[in-house]
């Protein structure tokens, strides 16, 4: 029954993350800005590529793909770092400050750029492997992609909260995942299912209108797009909040505010309110490791 226990923990994380977002809706501003900035970057990049080379060859496409992955990863990571800093403020009982979150991300712009560059190279390698249609290549690409995602799951909170070098930040992310894999899997699954439910709920009014009044198809389509975008925005924000809570749990001696009552150790909801974090798993870690001021 461990699967259902993890799933209960995941839904508990999703509920508590929703409470955080409900009490502090301004947190959604950061993923929204990230989405707009990312779209503008992609549009500008491809505009330049096709303006300079109307029929780009493979070397040009590889460079363009590197630039695409690099810029997209940096933008997403920068605003995610700001979101996580703000989420941590709410866990400390303070009012989140978007300005302070952006400043915290700005202080770590070097590591974020390095992370984006490494991620871009890995992304292009995976993409090149995927272009081989053979089954072994597809399997290698899939395994490589999953392993990379697991290894770097906590890379952004490590960057924003810890003073570590390039190699160490990957080691710290891996260590945190290794010691909280069950909780991380449950939280990701719970928030993912909630996001799917939000997408369905967001698209439903437009779908109903489309079938009820086909003549208003354009309006119905607009409602569907807006509903799905808002649901995706909420899902991204909830993911950032839940991941920050997991990270704080892994590095502090207390369960984050809003997440009291979740028995992390048993992966259930409503057990021992103070599980004591993972300070026992991280020897000598009282509070966030190497906390940045």
Where are these regions (language model features)?
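Hydrophobic alpha-helical membrane segments
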Residues: 1-293
